[in-house]
Structure formats: C-alpha cells, structure tokens
C-alpha cells in the first residue's frame, strides 16, 4: 500500500490485558494511531492504563455502543474469547473492522478436532489424535494406541478446564489422564518431540502473506526443563516473508481454498513439529500470539496500515524494518511461577536503569508511587535488532534492570530449539 487506508488519525481499540495489550497500544500509537483498550479480565490493567484510555468489562459489559460513539476504526482482539461474548453479533453487525476471523473461520483455533479434520481433507501431516469424552474412553484409546500424548482441551479458550499437558511417555499419559477435568472431554494428540516451531502470517484479500517464523520456550526452566508454563518464558522471532523454512508452503498454503471459502481474513499461526524430515501441524491459532505480537508491531515499518488492511480484507504490502528483522522476548516470572496456586507476597518491582528496548508490564499494580507484583508474570522484555544475536543480547541487557525479590527468567533463550528444527 503506497497510501494509508485511513487518511486521518485511525482510532484503534485493543481487547485484552497485560503486556500484550499494552505493547500493541504503544507500538501502534507510535505509528500515529489513537489507541484505547477494553480490559477483558480482572487483572493486568496497569500496563494498558499507561498507554491510553481503558474500559473495564465489569463497568462496561457491552463495549460496542462506546466503540460506535468514539468512532473506532479498528478492533484488535488479543484472544479469541471475544467471539463467545454476548455482544459478538452486535460488533460484527456494526461494520467496525476487526483484526480477527469470525464465524466458521474461527473454528480453526477454537475447535482442535476441526483443525485436524481440515488437515486430513487437504493432505496436511497431522499427528494421531482423538477426542475422548471421559477417562475410560481416553484410557482405552491410549492402551489401544500406546504412544505418549499431549493432553489438550477439545475447545480452545482462556478459561478451558484443561490446559495443555505434555506427556513424553505412555506411563506419563496414563497417569495424567486420571487427574484432568473431563467436563469438555479431552483432545489427545501424539507427542511429536521437542523440535517445534511456528509461523505467523496474515490472510487478506484471499491471499496468504508470510510474516515471521518464531520459536517459543514453553517450559519454565533452563534446559527446557520443568512443566510447560501457562504462557512461554521467552521466544525468538525472525522476519520471514519469503517462507525460508517452508512452513507456509507445507502447512498453510494447502488451506487456501478453505480460507477463501470461509472469507478468512486475519492473523493465522501454525505451530509444527519436525519428525523424519517432515513438518506436522500441532495446532493453528488465529491471533498474533503473546510472544510474537509485541515484537511484530516493532518489526513492521507500517503496522497500522497492515492491521487496517487485513481487517478490511484488502491486499496488503508489508514492509519490514531492515534493522529490526529479528526479535527476542524474555519474561520475568514472579514468586511461585509456574505453579499458579502458590500465591506470593505483595512485593515491590523496581526498574533500575533506563530501558534500551521495550519493557511491557504484565501482572503489576501501582500504589503510592511504587510498583508492586500482583500476579505471577511481572513483565515481558521485547527487543528487535538486525541480527538474532544482537536481539538476544539486547533483551538480556534490559531484563537485568528489573528487580523483584525471588523473580527469575530463563538464561538460555537461543541456546536450543533454534534454528527451526533444532533440538
């Protein structure tokens, strides 16, 4: 796009909380947008409140009338839970562009078995998988098909009764199956090893636009040890508009007829595992992601135009900053994480030095001019640079400037699982 899709100052409302919402707000504001945020949960309000006006869902149960009143030009959801809100249809009927697919297209992420069936239909490699309604059915399936399985909720949502449990042996799988909530059943997916990677692109105007290849460090501790955390502890991002690793060609391009059939327009992420020289789909998502999104907005030269163009289902021209082709994300975790039932004290958070890259506050609050930890994930440090090595070094340089008693961060981002396909 040689000209902006919005000649005036575009008004953008983010739906979300925490560092992910704050990052989108600041990055888009820096590119000329007027930003605000609809806070969708009870926590993580501090970061967005520093970047623009906020509305709290408990005080404003339906944001659509205010969106119309304010003349909002674009809505950017951080999660798919907007699609189950009571005001979803009113938002869709309003005509306000949304950076998200809707209707059947949303099922690509929402319904894990729907994604599996799509892969089967279009010849895309997918691990052995099964939806079980209760423990007996799940147990019997594993006994009949003795492999380690990843246990997921069949329906993807932030409040799902089952959060992803990665089992690396048959015995681990059988043990965990005794301890999960079967209120929505379980989705069992063959464990494919640790050689995972992801790619995020945009679908717009009936075409797929490759964007970035990314790695998420999902386990809590160095050496990829400990449990899979509720959100990654770090990540790497590489601008990849030419599909350097073939993920778009193998795992997204075959879905192009379906994208067009469902009028899909929005972000799409595929997470895949490499086995025997072949990429297998693990899951699809329809948002920019908690680790990649904040870096992506900095890596693009024209993020406002890109976001508006995709939301309007137009052809787009993505332009990356050549000096920001690589990104690194680090999470500062607080007392008790990733064991979220452990509640820590009300500890102070101090920034000891001027940041030289983005620091986005997550579960913190302010009182009497001081900042305090209010949850388990304190901050996300996001860097972008001209090389991966420089991006990693910049992120580590800045996370050291944050102090909170008993907090921690991973020290080994980039030392494994990169480049894509590495152990």
Enumerate the predicted regions with their spans.
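ATP-binding N-terminal substructure of ATP-dependent carboxylate-amine bond-forming enzymes
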Residues: 1-102
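A conserved helix-loop-beta module that forms one wall/lid of the active-site cleft
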Residues: 99-164
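Glycine-rich phosphate-binding loop of ATP-grasp-fold ATP-dependent ligases
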Residues: 127-129, 149-176, 187, 193-200, ...
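Phosphate-binding core of ATP-grasp and ATP-grasp-like enzymes
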Residues: 180-185, 192-239, 248-281, 285-292
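Active-site "cap" helix and flanking loop/linker of ATP-utilizing ligase/carboxylase catalytic domains
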Residues: 248-269, 285-354, 367
């Amino acid at each position: 796009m040689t000209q902006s899709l919005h000649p005036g100052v575009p008004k953008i409302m983010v739906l979300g909380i925490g560092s992910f919402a704050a990052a989108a707000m600041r990055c888009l504001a820096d590119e000329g947008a007027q930003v605000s945020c609809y806070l969708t949960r009870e926590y993580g309000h501090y970061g967005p409140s520093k970047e623009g006006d906020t509305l709290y869902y408990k005080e404003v149960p339906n944001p659509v009338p205010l969106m119309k009143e304010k003349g909002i030009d674009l809505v950017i959801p951080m999660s798919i839970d907007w699609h189950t809100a009571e005001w979803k249809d009113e938002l869709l009927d309003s005509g306000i562009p949304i950076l998200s697919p809707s209707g059947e297209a949303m099922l690509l992420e929402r319904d894990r078995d729907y994604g599996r069936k799509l892969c089967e239909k279009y010849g895309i490699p997918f691990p052995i998988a099964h939806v079980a309604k209760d423990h007996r059915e799940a147990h019997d399936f594993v006994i009949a098909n003795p492999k380690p399985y990843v246990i997921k909720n069949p329906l993807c949502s932030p409040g799902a009764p089952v959060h992803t449990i990665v089992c690396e042996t048959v015995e681990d799988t059988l043990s965990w199956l005794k301890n999960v909530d079967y209120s929505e059943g379980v989705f069992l997916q063959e464990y494919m090893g640790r050689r995972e990677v992801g790619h995020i692109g945009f679908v717009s105007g009936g075409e797929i636009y490759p964007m970035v290849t990314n790695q998420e460090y999902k386990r809590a501790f160095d050496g990829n040890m400990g449990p899979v955390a509720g959100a990654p502890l770090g990540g790497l991002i590489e601008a990849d508009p030419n599909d350097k690793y073939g993920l778009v060609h193998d795992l997204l391009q075959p879905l192009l007829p379906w994208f067009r059939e469902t009028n899909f327009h929005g972000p799409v992420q595929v997470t895949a595992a490499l086995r025997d020289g072949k990429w297998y789909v693990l899951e699809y998502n329809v948002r920019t992601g908690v680790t990649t999104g904040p870096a992506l907005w900095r890596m693009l030269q024209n993020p406002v135009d890109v976001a508006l163009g995709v939301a309007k289902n137009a052809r787009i021209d993505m332009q990356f900053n050549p000096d920001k082709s690589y990104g690194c994300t680090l999470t500062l975790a607080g007392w008790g994480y990733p064991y979220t039932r452990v509640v820590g004290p009300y500890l102070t958070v101090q920034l000891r030095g001027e940041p030289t890259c983005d620091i986005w506050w997550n579960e913190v609050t302010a009182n009497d001019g001081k900042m305090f930890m209010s949850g388990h994930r304190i901050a996300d440090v996001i860097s972008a640079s001209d090389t991966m090595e420089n991006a990693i070094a910049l992120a580590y340089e800045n996370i050291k400037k944050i102090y909170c008693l008993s907090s921690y961060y991973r020290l080994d981002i980039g030392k494994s699982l990169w480049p894509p396909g590495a152990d």
